[in-house]
Amino acid sequence: MVYNDFLKLAKSSIQERIYVGEGSLDTYRENVETFKSEHSDIIEKYSLTEPELFVMFMMLINNSDEIQQCASSGNGTPFAKECVRQYDSFLSKVPISDNAIFYGLDPSDRVENYVNISTFNYKRYMIASTRQSIFDNLKNGVKYIINKRRIDKTKAHEVMWWNDANNTKTICFERNTKFEINRLDRINKIIELTEL
């Protein structure tokens, strides 16, 4: 999709529903322009498009609820559906993570959802980190410790590989990644998973 058409779709979505957030459309556009000026080598190397970068920033800045809902259900506004398409494309282009263990969160805080199952299909995009300290001071949410598949089979992509401060990487698993539950700690709400 051409970037101007993508932005028109974003604007129409904002008018239907405050979707991208009050004033955020300009912020995301500015983020894309800054990224283009500072990382043209990355854009060229991975053939990234402006709509893909726009959605990447939406996902990284935690304005992704409707994108995640659309990713898991297939239902959503035309803009949400386009965002899912663009983010799928983005993930298909960016590097696979070479880390073996990741740390993620399920904000639902419902560890009992995992008690009677051995595997599950995570329909949304799972955002994770290579840094365990994301668990520090966490009061709510189920904590995931994720063991990755072999590097040639994993669906874990590095989504901020150009800016890994302190060797910390932000990872995103493709939607519909399947996981096996290895260990469940109901008291501390920690689930150890293996990507299947």
Positions of the model-derived regions?
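Mono-ADP-ribosyltransferase
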Residues: 1-196
